[in-house]
Amino acid sequence: MIQEQTMLNVADNSGARRVMCIKVLGGSHRRYADVGDIIKITIKEAIPRGKVKKGDVLKAVVVRTKKGVRRPDGSVIRFDSNACVLLNNNSEQVIGTRIFGPVTRELRNEKFMKIISLAPEVL
């Protein structure tokens, strides 16, 4: 459950370490984002010589949440931290070339197959 002002870890090698959600996209008064949703973020902490820098405003897709994802069989997949993967603002393509940590099967639609293929583990 990601909302405005939520701090997230970054699960790719784009150069950002911590980001903050500034808007949940998809509806005029949408409050929460879940796994697979696109959010608008600003970078709060970045490494030197990365592809992005502190203060950049980008889009990101949520790949892990502490709240978890409920499956149709009743099971719930939860993670220890909230994490996202950064996307290009215009084309919504993945900025990084590697994904760190597991991602959920809920990302498996045409838009995020790139994230699924780069991820080391799909739960």
UniProtKB/Swiss-Prot annotation:
UniProtKB keywords: Ribonucleoprotein, Ribosomal protein, RNA-binding, rRNA-binding
GO cellular component: cytosolic large ribosomal subunit
Disulfide bonds: none
Listed InterPro entries: Ribosomal_uL14, Ribosomal_uL14_bac-type, Ribosomal_uL14_CS, Ribosomal_uL14_sf
Transmembrane parts of this sequence: none
Cross-referenced Gene3D superfamilies: Ribosomal protein L14
Superkingdom classification of source: Bacteria
A GO term, aspect molecular function: structural constituent of ribosome
GO biological process: one example: translation
SMART domains the UniProt entry points to: Ribosomal_L14
Quaternary structure note: Part of the 50S ribosomal subunit. Forms a cluster with proteins L3 and L19. In the 70S ribosome, L14 and L19 interact and together make contacts with the 16S rRNA in bridges B5 and B8.
Similarity section: Belongs to the universal ribosomal protein uL14 family.
Summary of the function given for this chain in its UniProt record: Binds to 23S rRNA. Forms part of two intersubunit bridges in the 70S ribosome.
Protein name: Large ribosomal subunit protein uL14
Gene source species: Proteus mirabilis (strain HI4320)
